[in-house]
């Protein structure tokens, strides 16, 4: 993970660690003019590693975004941001997106009162995301909420930390997307 972060820059969804000061002598020899191919590849890899997608999954999202009305890039980012694992990460119920994926896979999360065990589940406006009533599920979420730094919550989400409940108000606005893509 740290190699990826060093190469691509900070990826908040992958890990909370930050790259070093940049005094790596190997890196200086590789600097120079970056080709268009390299720039596009790095931006694509940022998306893949940040959201934890395979190449095939990303291509499928690009295909869906291309068919939709509006800017393909913006629609793609909206699709990725509305995934259940990413929404759990944005709500602060998990420290990283892989951590959120694990919570979903282990069946700790309910969407509108139903267990959802698919991390790529596409949330819609007015979806209510809660934890299972089991003590273990609530304890896991409580630890994440207590330990996470309270960053500003995007305006398309609201959270009730006492009931461990999140609400999707609307589709994400472009200014709230946490990843800087060129």
Swiss-Prot record:
One GO process term, biological-process aspect: ribosomal small subunit biogenesis
S4 RNA-binding domain residues: 82-143
Cell compartments where the protein resides: Plastid, Chloroplast
Keywords recorded for this protein, A-Z: Chloroplast, Plastid, Ribonucleoprotein, Ribosomal protein, RNA-binding, rRNA-binding
Pfam families recorded: Ribosomal_S4, S4
Statement: the UniProt record of this protein carries the keyword Chloroplast: yes
Keyword RNA-binding in record: yes
Membrane-spanning residues: none
GO cellular component: chloroplast; small ribosomal subunit
PANTHER family in the record: 30S 40S RIBOSOMAL PROTEIN (PTHR11831), SMALL RIBOSOMAL SUBUNIT PROTEIN US4M (PTHR11831:SF4)
Protein family: Belongs to the universal ribosomal protein uS4 family.
Function: One of the primary rRNA binding proteins, it binds directly to 16S rRNA where it nucleates assembly of the body of the 30S subunit. With S5 and S12 plays an important role in translational accuracy.
Subunit details: Part of the 30S ribosomal subunit. Contacts protein S5. The interaction surface between S4 and S5 is involved in control of translational fidelity.
Record-given protein name: Small ribosomal subunit protein uS4c
Organism whose genome encodes this protein: Dietes robinsoniana (Lord Howe wedding lily)
Lineage of origin: Eukaryota, Viridiplantae, Streptophyta, Embryophyta, Tracheophyta
Gene coding for it: rps4
């Amino acid at each position: 993970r740290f190699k990826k972060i060093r190469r691509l820059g900070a990826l908040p969804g992958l890990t909370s660690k930050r790259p070093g000061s940049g005094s790596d002598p190997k890196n200086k020899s590789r600097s120079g003019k970056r080709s268009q191919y390299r720039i596009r590849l790095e931006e694509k890899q940022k998306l893949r590693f940040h959201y934890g997608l395979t190449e095939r999954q990303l291509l499928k999202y690009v295909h869906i975004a291309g068919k939709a009305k509006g800017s393909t890039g913006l629609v793609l980012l909206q699709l990725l941001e509305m995934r259940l694992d990413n929404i759990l990460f944005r709500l602060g119920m998990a420290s990283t997106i892989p951590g959120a994926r694990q919570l979903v896979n282990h069946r700790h999360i309910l969407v509108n009162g139903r267990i959802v065990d698919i991390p790529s589940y596409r949330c819609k406006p007015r979806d209510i995301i809660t934890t299972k009533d089991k003590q273990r599920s609530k304890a896991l979420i409580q630890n994440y909420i207590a330990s996470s730094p309270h960053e500003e919550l995007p305006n398309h989400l609201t959270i009730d930390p006492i009931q461990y409940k999140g609400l999707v108000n609307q589709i994400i606005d472009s200014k709230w997307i946490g990843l800087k893509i060129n």
